Amino acid sequence: MPELPEVETSRRGIEPYLVGQTILYAVVRNARLRWPVSDEILTLSDQPVLSVQRRAKYLLLELPKGWIIIHLGMSGSLRVLSEETAAEKHDHVDLVVSNGKILRYTDPRRFGAWLWAKDLETSNVLAHLGPEPLSDEFTAQYLFDKSRNKRTLIKPWLMDNKVVVGVGNIYASESLFAAGILPDRAAGSLTDAESVLLVATIKAVLLHSIEQGGTTLRDFLQSDGKPGYFAQELQVYGRAGEPCRQCGHPIEIAKHGQRSTFFCRHCQH
């Protein structure tokens, strides 16, 4: 599933081709995504794009009359293509833009979403979200205070969007490894010092992944069709049984909340 770095990579990739341009109309080949494509998108015409933003794992296209909210789901990606580029099997939505380009949404598993909101404050999918991990709101003190008396395992707790947004399965495993913290500890066991280190590593891992264009494990592509290169730098995720790059001990795998967690028991405590 695309996580924060992949969504931010998509945002940065599509922004130069959309802002200041006009969406002439939308082509929806299959409206049956996780939720049906909103009617307002089906009938969209001649709408200038004011900004391209991101909140958590949602892309937000600001138009004069409201917002298009895009979620990439499990396997979605956005590409900027020439208008004459023929659609393929899993190309479900196009936005046709005044500069001769199209923004094409591809999603083999159709678990993404294209929604409409009159304003972001009334959007159900954006309600109750925690702070952005790269913002000044996400501090060691915030994380420490939030973790008090929490018996939930720290790794699934970090993936809770009410705690902090956008830290999905890949980056929770990678950040905990970088901080030297075992993922099966209770969140409430975090110390002050560990909170400082964990917040710093989450920010560093996410920023480095964004610089590398995100992580491509299966379906994700950048807006120019290239894969994300952070997959080549993964320390633990997807490496069960392989030697740890720091100590040589085998990377272990466990199931936490039906998600695979990767860690090194020798380097993490």
From Swiss-Prot:
The Swiss-Prot or TrEMBL record lists the needed cofactor(s) as: Zn(2+)
Cofactor binding, note field: Binds 1 zinc ion per subunit.
Catalysed reactions listed for this entry: Hydrolysis of DNA containing ring-opened 7-methylguanine residues, releasing 2,6-diamino-4-hydroxy-5-(N-methyl)formamidopyrimidine; 2'-deoxyribonucleotide-(2'-deoxyribose 5'-phosphate)-2'-deoxyribonucleotide-DNA = a 3'-end 2'-deoxyribonucleotide-(2,3-dehydro-2,3-deoxyribose 5'-phosphate)-DNA + a 5'-end 5'-phospho-2'-deoxyribonucleoside-DNA + H(+)
Write down the Gene3D superfamilies for this protein, in alphabetical order.
1.10.8.50, MutM-like, N-terminal
**Which residues are annotated as active site?**
P2 (schiff-base intermediate with dna), E3 (proton donor), K57 (proton donor), R259 (proton donor)
Q: Which Pfam families match?
A: Fapy_DNA_glyco, H2TH, zf-FPG_IleRS
Q: Which PROSITE patterns match?
A: FPG_CAT, ZF_FPG_1, ZF_FPG_2
Under InterPro entries, the record lists: DNA_glyclase/AP_lyase_DNA-bd, DNA_glyclase_Znf_dom_DNA_BS, Formamido-pyr_DNA_Glyclase, FPG_cat, MutM-like_N-ter, Ribosomal_uS13-like_H2TH, Znf_DNA_glyclase/AP_lyase, Znf_FPG/IleRS
GO annotation, biological process: base-excision repair
* Annotated EC: 3.2.2.23, 4.2.99.18
> What's the family?
Belongs to the FPG family.
Q: How does it assemble?
A: Monomer.
Instruction: Describe the task this protein carries out.
Output: Involved in base excision repair of DNA damaged by oxidation or by mutagenic agents. Acts as a DNA glycosylase that recognizes and removes damaged bases. Has a preference for oxidized purines, such as 7,8-dihydro-8-oxoguanine (8-oxoG). Has AP (apurinic/apyrimidinic) lyase activity and introduces nicks in the DNA strand. Cleaves the DNA backbone by beta-delta elimination to generate a single-strand break at the site of the removed base with both 3'- and 5'-phosphates.
What name has this protein been given in UniProt? Formamidopyrimidine-DNA glycosylase
Tell me what organism the protein belongs to.
Answer: Yersinia pestis
